[in-house]
């Protein structure tokens, strides 16, 4: 399931679009995607790839918002230290899982199909990604954070990355609290090496 969310992040390259030419969110998404694709093609190994793409992804993906939403209402019961640790672990998990799916030299592609604004300060960019002969419908949910558009969720074939993690972490939080969520994320990170 996680592979379906991460392949499109790898698979993006520039293509045509139905969004306005001056669409700040789409322009920002495309620029970040181009950087990641270039870095990924040049990386010699997974460690180098993680190191190089982390600042680019941290600039476009809002890991704090994604982590908070993946944890859900229980987030408010986390201490500030637990919140920082959860964001760090979630970020590491996404980066490791993402880079594990990359094969150097491949040239995945994406078609930018449309932009929609479900509410002020929010945009959904619909795409179709083609990777290894498979086609994926991908929607990037972006939010305006004080003039800086960031991705707050990725929806693959109708399934939200944030909702997928939330379905896993809700039960853990209900049974074991914040400490249990941290331990679950630690295990997932350890398993992703």
What are these regions (language model features)?
Residues 22-98:
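Early exported N-terminus immediately downstream of N-terminal targeting peptides
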Residues 95-136, 188-193:
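Surface-exposed, charged secondary-structure patches
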Residues 153-193:
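Low-complexity, intrinsically disordered terminal/linker segments enriched in charged
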Residues 38, 42-48, 77-81, 104-107, ...:
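Surface-exposed, polar/charged faces of alpha-helical domains
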Residues 135-163:
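Short beta-strand edge/turn micro-motifs at domain boundaries
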Residues 5-14:
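Sec-dependent N-terminal signal peptides
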Residues 15-20:
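N-terminal signal peptide c-region/cleavage motif recognized by signal peptidases
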Residues 1-2:
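N-terminal secretory signal peptides that target proteins for export/translocation
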